[in-house]
Amino acid sequence: MSNPLTTAPTSVSFTSADRVALTMQALDLLSPEERDLVVWFAGEVRRNAWSHGEAGKRIGIDGSNIGRIFNGNYAGNWQNVLEKIRTFRHLQAEREKMTRAEFVETSVWERVRQTCDMALINQMPAILVGVSQIGKTHALKEYMRRSHHLVRYVRIPAGGTLRDTLFAIADACGVGAGVNALRVRARILSALNSRTLLIIDELHQLTLAKPMTAVKVMEFIREILDETGCGLVVCGTRALQQELLQGQMAAWLDQFEQRCITRTVLDDRLSDRDIGKVAEAYGVAEKPDGDTLKVLRTLRMNRLVKLLMLAGTLARKQEMPTTWDHFMAAYTAVNR
C-alpha cells in the first residue's frame, strides 16, 4: 500500500516525547480507523514520555521513523505501521486487564455508563452531576478504558484561563504539544468527530474562573459540538448545577442545556447494595452489624475503598480473612 501521507504538508516538528504533535492535515488523508490508531499511539507516546527510540521499540520499527509518522512524511510501508500499532494497542489492553485494580460495577457506574452511551450514540451533550468522592471520575475513566470507541477525558483546570482549558482539551486529544495558541483550536476540532466521545470532568472549576472566562470556555464547548458532531459529557459537583447552570450564567448556558439529551444527578451517598458489592470485592463477605452500617452510610466511595484496603492490610498482618472488625479498627485508627 502506498503512503497516503507523503504529499501532506509537514508543518510540525519535534524531537522528544514531550513535544508529540500531529499534522492534522496529514491525518485527514487516512481512513477513520487508521486516523484513530495514529492519534491513539501519539497519545501513548506523550502520556508515557517515551523517546522516539523507545516508541519505535514498542511497535517494532526504527525510532527515527516515529517523527516521520506523526508529521506525515513517512515513506515506508504505511499498512505495516498501522498493523504494528493495532497489535501494540491490543497488547496494552490485555496488560491493563492483568494489572489494574478490580473495578466494582456499582449503581454509580451503571448510571455513568448509560449517560456516556446516550451521548456517544446520539452525538449529543449530556450533563452528569454528583457530589465529590462518590466515584464519578473513576467510573468515567473506566468507561474510557472499556470503550471500543475513541473516548477523550479532560479535567478542567481550577481557576484557569481560556488558554489553559484549550490546551488541557488539546492534550487529552493528543494534539496539544508543540503548537501555538492560535492553532490549538483548529487542532482540537480536527481531532474530534462523530465517532468520538469527549468527557469534560470537573466543569464546576469554572466557578473559580472569571465570569467571562467561563462564558468563553462554554462557548468553545458549544463550538466543538457544532463543528465536530462528537458526543459530549460534562461532569461536575453540585456547584456545576447551582452556580453555572442555574446561577448567574444561566442565561448564557440555557441554549447548551436545552441541547442536552439527558441530565443525570447521582445520589449523594452509596446504597447499602453498593456498599456490599464493594466490600465483597475486598474480601468482606458477611453483612455488617448495625453500628458498622451506620458508619458505612456516612462514607463515599473513595474513603470506603481506602478503609477497606487498610482493613485488608491489618488482616494480612494477623494472617486472617478480612472482617468488619478489621474495617472498624482501620476507621477508628484514622479518625483519632
Predicted regions and their residues:
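AAA+/P-loop NTPase substrate/partner-engagement loops
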Residues: 149-173, 191, 260
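Pre-Walker A adenine-sensing motif
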Residues: 103-120
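DNA major-groove recognition helix of helix-turn-helix/homeodomain DNA-binding modules
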Residues: 79-96
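Walker A/P-loop nucleotide-binding motif
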Residues: 121-142
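Sensor-1/coupling segment of RecA-like P-loop NTPase cores
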Residues: 127-132, 222-250
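C-terminal alpha-helical "lid" subdomain
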Residues: 2-71, 76-80, 268, 272-336
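A short helix-turn-beta junction within AAA+ P-loop NTPase domains corresponding to the substrate/partner-engaging
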Residues: 149-151, 246-267
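Mid-core helix/loop region of P-loop NTP-binding domains shared across ATPases and GTPases
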Residues: 165, 176-231, 269-277, 291-308, ...
